[in-house]
């Protein structure tokens, strides 16, 4: 399973660790992904999404039905 938010599309990005001596080594910045179950009232079932915490805030703002409709319009299986 890839580390990609299903709502926002956030992915890991790369950067550098910086020591006190300014040495740099490559590292990855991972998104804060959570597996979360949401109840769909109109379908009478749970859906499990792998979403970032920003994706959770978007769902709180728009509502889960609207977000699921947008995912299905993009062709993502939910």
Curated annotation (Swiss-Prot):
GO molecular-function terms, A-Z: structural constituent of ribosome
Residue ranges of the TM segments: none
Any single GO CC term annotated in Swiss-Prot or TrEMBL for this entry: cytosolic large ribosomal subunit
GO biological process, one term: translation
Residues covered by region (Disordered): 1-23
Record bears the keyword Nucleotide-binding: no
This protein's UniProt keywords: Ribonucleoprotein, Ribosomal protein
Tagged with keyword Ribosomal protein: yes
Family: Belongs to the bacterial ribosomal protein bL28 family.
HAMAP family given in the database record: Ribosomal_bL28 (MF_00373)
PANTHER family: 39S RIBOSOMAL PROTEIN L28, MITOCHONDRIAL, LARGE RIBOSOMAL SUBUNIT PROTEIN BL28M
Protein name in the entry: Large ribosomal subunit protein bL28
């Amino acid at each position: 399973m890839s580390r990609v938010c299903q709502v926002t599309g956030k992915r890991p990005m790369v950067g550098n660790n910086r020591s006190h001596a300014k040495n740099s080594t490559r590292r990855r910045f991972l998104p804060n992904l959570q597996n979360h179950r949401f109840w769909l009232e109109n379908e009478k079932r749970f859906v499990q999404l792998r979403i970032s915490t920003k994706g959770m805030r978007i769902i709180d703002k728009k509502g889960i039905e609207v977000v699921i409709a947008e995912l299905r319009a993009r062709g993502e299986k939910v």
